[in-house]
Amino acid sequence: MPQLDTSTWFINIVSMILTLFIVFQLKISKHSYPMHPEAKTTKMAKRLTPWESKWTKIYSPLSLPQQ
């Protein structure tokens, strides 16, 4: 049964990693980023819901006094 020749595996793997690195660097360098990014202002209409007109208080179990 013949032995598997693995002598070329190292150079194949190294060249593949190098090629992928170069390709990704070129892809990233060609990407155009906005020069001055700014936050978008969103105008939301204020809707009055039934529970907003009433006073409610929610008690968290951790904020209750110790017994």
Curated annotation (Swiss-Prot):
Its main location: mitochondrion. It is a single-pass membrane protein. The keyword Acetylation applies. GO terms for cellular component: mitochondrial membrane; proton-transporting ATP synthase complex. It comes from the Eukaryota. The modification N6-acetyllysine is found at K54, K57. The chain crosses the membrane at residues 8-24. The keyword Lipoprotein does not apply. Keywords: Acetylation, ATP synthesis, CF(0), Hydrogen ion transport, Ion transport, Membrane, Mitochondrion, Transmembrane, Transmembrane helix, Transport. The modification N6-succinyllysine is found at K54. It holds the Pfam family ATP-synt_8. It is found in: Mitochondrion membrane. One of its GO terms (biological process) is proton motive force-driven ATP synthesis. GO terms for molecular function: proton transmembrane transporter activity. Belongs to the ATPase protein 8 family. Subunit 8, of the mitochondrial membrane ATP synthase complex (F(1)F(0) ATP synthase or Complex V) that produces ATP from ADP in the presence of a proton gradient across the membrane which is generated by electron transport complexes of the respiratory chain. ATP synthase complex consist of a soluble F(1) head domain - the catalytic core - and a membrane F(1) domain - the membrane proton channel. These two domains are linked by a central stalk rotating inside the F(1) region and a stationary peripheral stalk. PANTHER family: ATP SYNTHASE PROTEIN 8. Component of the ATP synthase complex composed at least of ATP5F1A/subunit alpha, ATP5F1B/subunit beta, ATP5MC1/subunit c (homooctomer), MT-ATP6/subunit a, MT-ATP8/subunit 8, ATP5ME/subunit e, ATP5MF/subunit f, ATP5MG/subunit g, ATP5MK/subunit k, ATP5MJ/subunit j, ATP5F1C/subunit gamma, ATP5F1D/subunit delta, ATP5F1E/subunit epsilon, ATP5PF/subunit F6, ATP5PB/subunit b, ATP5PD/subunit d, ATP5PO/subunit OSCP. This is ATP synthase F(0) complex subunit 8. It comes from Equus asinus.
